[in-house]
């Protein structure tokens, strides 16, 4: 957890005029007591309760401060100090007083591609530094591209407002809905995994506007704007791009690619011929077209300031973000239900197979019982035949001569013993047959 100075910022800085404001932040000019150095004090309203939507969460503030403390680059605003009180965290930032780049360019009588690329090169250098540290700005737009001093011979670009910047961790999926609708990438609109590529899309939109004074995806409503972005619905209208080089258009085309993996990276953009090669343009008609381009840029700048509050970063889409999160949760629940349904079907199929196998075993068992019964019946028939034969032999013996009387008695005795034994065996077999018949009937009933 980051620690900030638990002191009254006004004990160290004299507060001055307000420079800008957002949904939960106010920026004021300030002067350090003792040194007279001028800075910008950004007052960020803290969120008091985790469940509240008012204010900025501690986690978000700490993330912004952590990123600002890490970065040091000529084209990125510098953090000097951080204070905290009961209601606010106060960032003491480098004072960037030259105004917005687009406002500066809109004041010029003419604008060449060479001048545009000089400023764009500074933007790319700043973004290249961020991306080298795996930091994505996620809110690159004209009002976050400032000049340190517009009166300097070669004004220096400063990238500001790291309120929604994130470190992109390898192997970790990150999704969110934020940014400014006109400049966000399709993967933000579609709630897909985000990376450094989203900044490159924003640079493509900024370049398009810089060269034409027209916004490539801006619709009559925010929803129309988002639809245009998702469909990559833009073109190079001849009215706006008649004097624009093919190299410049190619630079934009390589950035405004829906698939982030196919989008030009920051390293590739710095190596693009339009950025590397400075071309001087001559001809009588070119200055007039360049003046027309600057006039259109003025119109865009005036329109954007009149239609959108300064330093507004997709705050109005927070509800949309929550809706998309709910939709994602519902889709996840649906996928789990479908998975459960598949598992139930698989279990039913397994039970059906088990029942069929059991039925087959019962049929096989019934067939075995039938074979045993037939075998016992055969044995019974043989036993009956033996009994009949014994009776016939006894009758034959009775018909013998008187001399055989003793033998006949013995035979009769033998017959009686044998008859008793046979009767017992016959009774046993009959009992066994009845038992087997009952088992067979019970088995057939169980199968049905």
Swiss-Prot record:
Compartments, as annotated in UniProt: Nucleus; Nucleus, PML body; Cytoplasm; Cytoplasm, Cytoskeleton, Microtubule organizing center
Catalytic residue list: 139 (proton acceptor)
Region (Activation segment): 161-204
Protein kinase domain boundaries: 13-275
A GO MF term: DNA-binding transcription factor binding
Reactions mediated catalytically: L-seryl-[protein] + ATP = O-phospho-L-seryl-[protein] + ADP + H(+); L-threonyl-[protein] + ATP = O-phospho-L-threonyl-[protein] + ADP + H(+)
Description of how activity is regulated: A sequential activation is proposed: autophosphorylation at consensus sites is leading to dimerization of the catalytic domain and activation segment exchange (producing an active confirmation of both kinase modules in trans) followed by phosphorylation at Thr-180 in the activation segment and at other regulatory sites. Phosphorylation at Thr-180, Thr-225 and Thr-265 is essential for activity. Inhibited by pyridone 6 (K00225), a potent, ATP-competitive inhibitor. Phosphorylation at Thr-180, Thr-225 and Thr-265 is essential for activity.
Annotated tissue distribution: Ubiquitously expressed in all tissue types examined. High levels in brain, heart, lung and spleen, lower expression in kidney, liver, skeletal muscle and testis. Isoform 2 is expressed in the smooth muscle.
Record region (Required for interaction with ATF4 but not with PAWR): 418-448
Keywords noted in UniProt: Activator, Apoptosis, ATP-binding, Centromere, Chromatin regulator, Chromosome, Cytoplasm, Cytoskeleton, Kinase, Nucleotide-binding, Nucleus, Phosphoprotein, Serine/threonine-protein kinase, Transcription, Transcription regulation, Transferase, Ubl conjugation
Binding of ATP, residues: 19-27, 42
Major place of residence: nucleus
Phosphothreonine, modified sites: 180, 225, 265
Post-translational changes noted in the entry: Ubiquitinated. Ubiquitination mediated by the UBE2D3 E3 ligase does not lead to proteasomal degradation, but influences promyelocytic leukemia protein nuclear bodies (PML-NBs) formation in the nucleus. The phosphorylation status is critical for kinase activity, oligomerization and intracellular localization. Phosphorylation at Thr-180, Thr-225 and Thr-265 is essential for activity. The phosphorylated form is localized in the cytoplasm and nuclear translocation or retention is maximal when it is not phosphorylated. Phosphorylation increases the trimeric form, and its dephosphorylation favors a kinase-inactive monomeric form.
Pfam families in UniProt: Pkinase
Keyword Magnesium among record annotations: no
Cofactor annotation: Mg(2+)
Summary of subunit composition and partner proteins: Homooligomer in its kinase-active form (homotrimers and homodimers are reported); monomeric in its kinase-inactive form. Homodimerization is required for activation segment autophosphorylation. Interacts with DAXX, ATF4, NLK, TCF7L2, UBE2D1, UBE2D2, UBE2D3 and CDC5L. Interacts with PAWR; also demonstrated in aorta smooth muscle cells indicative for the cytoskeletal targeting function of PAWR. Interacts with AR; enhanced by AATF. Interacts with LUZP1; the interaction is likely to occur throughout the cell cycle and reduces the LUZP1-mediated suppression of MYL9 phosphorylation.
Role played: Serine/threonine kinase which is involved in the regulation of apoptosis, autophagy, transcription, translation and actin cytoskeleton reorganization. Regulates both type I (caspase-dependent) apoptotic and type II (caspase-independent) autophagic cell deaths signal, depending on the cellular setting. Involved in formation of promyelocytic leukemia protein nuclear body (PML-NB). Involved in apoptosis involving PAWR which mediates cytoplasmic relocation; in vitro phosphorylates PAWR. Regulates myosin phosphorylation in both smooth muscle and non-muscle cells.
More info: A species-specific loss of a key phosphorylation site in murine DAPK3 seems to direct it mainly to the nucleus which is proposed to be compensated by the interaction with PAWR to maintain at least the cytoplasmic basic membrane blebbing function in the apoptosis pathway.
Protein's name in the database: Death-associated protein kinase 3
Name of the coding gene: Dapk3
């Amino acid at each position: 957890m980051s620690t900030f100075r638990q002191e009254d910022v006004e004990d160290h800085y004299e507060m001055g005029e307000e420079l800008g404001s957002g949904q939960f932040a106010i920026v004021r000019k300030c002067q350090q007591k003792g040194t007279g150095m001028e800075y910008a004090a950004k007052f960020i309203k803290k969120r008091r309760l985790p469940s509240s939507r008012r204010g900025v969460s501690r986690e978000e503030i700490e993330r912004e401060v952590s990123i600002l403390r890490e970065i040091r680059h000529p084209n990125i605003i510098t953090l000097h100090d951080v204070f905290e009180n009961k209601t606010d965290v106060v960032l003491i930032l480098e004072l960037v007083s030259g105004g917005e780049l687009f406002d500066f360019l809109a004041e010029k009588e003419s604008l060449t591609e060479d001048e545009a690329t000089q400023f764009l090169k500074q933007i790319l250098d700043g973004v290249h530094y961020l991306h080298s540290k795996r930091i994505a700005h996620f809110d690159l737009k004209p009002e976050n591209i400032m000049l340190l001093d517009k009166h300097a011979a070669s004004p220096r670009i400063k990238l500001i407002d790291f309120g929604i910047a994130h470190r992109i961790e390898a192997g970790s999926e990150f999704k969110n809905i934020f940014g400014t609708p006109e400049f966000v990438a399709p993967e933000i609109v579609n709630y897909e995994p985000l990376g450094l590529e989203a900044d490159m899309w924003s640079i493509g939109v900024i370049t398009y506007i810089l060269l034409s004074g027209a916004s490539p995806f801006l619709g009559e409503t925010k929803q129309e704007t988002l639809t245009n972005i998702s469909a990559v619905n833009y073109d190079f209208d001849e009215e706006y791009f008649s004097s624009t080089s093919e190299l410049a258009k190619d630079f934009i085309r390589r950035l405004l690619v829906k698939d982030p993996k196919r989008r030009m990276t920051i390293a590739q953009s710095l190596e693009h011929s339009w950025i590397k090669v400075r071309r001087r343009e001559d001809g009588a008609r070119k200055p007039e077209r360049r003046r027309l381009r600057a006039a259109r840029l003025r119109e865009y700048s005036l329109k954007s300031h009149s239609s959108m509050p300064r330093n507004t970063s997709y705050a109005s889409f927070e509800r949309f973000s929550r809706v998309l999160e709910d939709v994602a949760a519902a889709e996840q629940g649906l996928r789990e239900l479908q998975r459960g349904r598949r598992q139930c079907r698989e279990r039913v199929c397994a039970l059906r197979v088990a029942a069929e196998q059991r039925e087959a075993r019962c049929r096989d068992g019934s067939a075995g019982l039938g074979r045993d019964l037939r075998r016992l019946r055969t044995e019974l028939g043989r036993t009956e035949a033996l009994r009949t034969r014994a009776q016939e032999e006894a009758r034959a013996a009775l018909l013998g001569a008187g001399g055989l009387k003793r033998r006949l008695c013995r035979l009769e005795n033998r017959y009686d013993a044998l008859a008793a034994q046979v009767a017992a065996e016959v009774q046993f077999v009959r009992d066994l047959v009845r038992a087997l018949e009952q088992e067979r009937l019970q088995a057939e009933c169980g199968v049905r």
